Amino acid sequence: MARTLFASLFLFLVLGLVAGQGDDTDGPDAESLASLDRTATRRYGDGEDLLHLLGQTGQHRTAMTKPNVILLLADDMGVGDLSVYGHPTQEPGFIDQMANQGLRFTQGYSGDSVCTPSRSAIVTGRQPIRTGVYGEERIFLPWTTTGLPLYEVTIAEAMKGAGYTTGMVGKWHLGINENSSSDGAHLPANRGFDFVGHNLPFGNSWRCDDTGLHQDFPDTNACFLYYNSTSVAQPFQHKGLTQLLRDDTVGFIEDNVNKPFFMYVSFAHMHTSLFSSDDFSCTSRRGRYGDNLREMDQAIEQIVTTLVDNDIDDNTVIFFTSDHGPHREYCGEGGDANVFRGGKGQSWEGGHRIPYIVYWPGTISPGVSHEIVTSMDIIATAVNLGGSQLPTDRIYDGKCLKSVLLEGASSPHDDFFYYCKDTLMAVRVGKYKAHFKTQTDSSQMKLGERCDGGFPLDDYFLCSDCEGDCVTEHNPPIMFDLEKDPGENYPLGPCGYEHVLLHVKDAIARHDAEMVIGTPVLDNFDFSIIPCCNPETNCVCNYTHEPGVAECYQDLINIALRNGVPK
């Protein structure tokens, strides 16, 4: 009781001094003091805690002038995967809570529908056709000698320029080596990140499955875990991976409490192969996919709890989204696109629509927005909130969302362009979308025929081509009203959209006029640069020293030495 009274008295004295500095300003009334007293006692406990907090005020002042920024990125998560976005059996979790207490967008778009180009769009704020992140291939492979071009300014480099400490964990997929199997020329440590924890330079894929479900042995050419720029496990152990990323993130936050930071947390969930720790296995009524989502959800909750424990939650803006739409070809292991047609790799809405949540307690009012936003907007928004600006010598497709987030303003986007490599597939103008080319989209019945017990047949892949037999060209384009028909099921008749087509053509003309196409960088290969932690063990090793894991890797090493491993 005495300590609480002390807290109240101390607050009264501080507020009295502040009020006395103004000539004509009245002091706080009794109700305001009572409210402040309740807040202080509830949040800080007693006078000693309050004194400690006030003693730290000077240290936190720099951080408070610049909000911390955290980008939480899911892999292959569909817009319909979360309960808050309408999934009927996925259990509500902490991400749903962030959506309900933050701003949830119903029209979030990815910069591309495939991993590498969509991630380049996020970290640069520019469409892949501008940055050159396209080619005959659609992604950076472990034997690609190039990476995200050095002339592109990454979100980490931009935030460093704004006075931020930068960190990254998880999936990178924007290049690895250039001249040798270990030079790490294109890794995140060379692209503006001060701290790089455990990361997947290539990513997780069905080839990394260590359960025997998809193949007998993980492919060492594609499955490696790094810490900073050093390989620590090849192939990596799935169990415990999410916890490693979480712990790295928590440590980074705690190390940078007193200065502004940007943290990029790029989860391996929800990409196939699915995985979860024993604590989450068989806990979701949705099955393995639900288990995976719940594990990622808890990691996010623990990251946010760290912000709360360090009293910086109200000075931290969090973006949660996905790189693109769900990989439907993986049947029961793929995500949910909700009502939207198509999925990963396609220009239908299902390939580009993503969950998009912005959470900033005390600053962003809770709500739902139907404005169009894109993953490319994150860099422009973060840099602006940090009091800086992006370079003016190039075109940015991403726009600053500050007024949308804080004032409920309209979207800065009047249109959106859907590319497949360097091919313009479709254009959205307002509520209308014009398709110039479409990929064959398998019906749900066809999907069911191609899935054996919920798992894909070896030869089953959806059409994600940009041209060829499974791509249909439309001249004139087929048109959809996305407000009335978000599933793109009912094309408008030609007599109903002549005026809209004029607006589409105008948008394309403006787009083409300012387009400088980047030189493609995805087709330069050298198989000698594939990462290999130890050639003497056929590239099978573990240096992470995780409890209970070393024995597992020793078994793998023995197999590799005895029989060799798939290359």
UniProtKB/Swiss-Prot annotation:
SUPFAM superfamilies: Alkaline phosphatase-like (SSF53649). GO terms for molecular function: arylsulfatase activity; metal ion binding. It catalyses: an aryl sulfate + H2O = a phenol + sulfate + H(+). It is found in: Secreted. The modification 3-oxoalanine (Cys) is found at C115. It comes from the Eukaryota. Its main location: secreted. Its EC number is 3.1.6.1. This is Arylsulfatase. It comes from Strongylocentrotus purpuratus (Purple sea urchin).
